């Protein structure tokens, strides 16, 4: 599973919607995107955690984590689109460490992170199997992977 050969097309679409990216996330989540991020993160991260925000976009998941811990976590933003990472300054007083790349090839050490966040992004992996393996590699043995995403229904609602 994963996007496979469609990944380039999806990346092109994501690049095009950068100006309205947050509005699109809100729309497709029926206005519940912030609520879902808060519910997923609250109580699951601790002060001092090292966090990888995989598929970070503008960094909304990271911003939520920083708000919940009063800034007492260490964040690394990671996204395939450099323009997304460059536009994170509107959310952060001090810009977190950031890198550009895909789920399947994280430029991180083995067991480097206490927590990996993936908000509305895992569905865009090239290869879901490889992405899961790579996230497992960079997570500490007792680490947590917090995923907020939407699925595609098998049938349309009539």
What are these regions (language model features)?
Residues 52-105:
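Class I SAM-dependent methyltransferase SAM/SAH-binding core
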Residues 104-116:
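A short acidic, Gly/Pro-enriched loop at the edge of an enzyme's catalytic core
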Residues 115-127:
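A short SAM/SAH-binding and catalytic strip from SAM-dependent methyltransferases
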Residues 146-158:
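Conserved class I S-adenosyl-L-methionine
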Residues 47, 139-144:
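Short glycine-dipeptide loop
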Residues 31-47, 64:
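Conserved alpha-helix/loop element of class I SAM-dependent methyltransferases that forms part
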Residues 1-20:
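N-terminal, positively charged/glycine-rich alpha-helical extensions of SAM-dependent methyltransferases
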């Amino acid at each position: 599973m994963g996007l496979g050969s469609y990944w380039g097309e999806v990346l092109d679409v994501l690049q095009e919607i950068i100006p309205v990216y947050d509005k699109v996330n809100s729309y497709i989540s029926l206005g519940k995107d912030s609520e879902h991020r808060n519910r997923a993160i609250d109580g699951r991260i601790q002060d001092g955690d090292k966090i990888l925000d995989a598929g970070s976009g503008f960094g909304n998941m990271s911003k939520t984590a920083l708000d919940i811990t009063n800034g007492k976590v260490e964040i690394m933003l990671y996204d395939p689109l450099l323009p997304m990472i460059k536009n994170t300054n509107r959310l952060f007083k001090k810009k977190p460490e950031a890198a550009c790349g895909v789920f399947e090839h994280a430029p991180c050490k083995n067991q480097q992170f206490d927590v990996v966040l993936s908000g509305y992004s895992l569905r865009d992996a090239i290869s879901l199997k490889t992405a899961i393996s790579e996230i497992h590699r960079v997570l500490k043995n007792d680490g947590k992977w917090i995923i907020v995403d939407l699925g595609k229904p098998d049938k349309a609602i009539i």
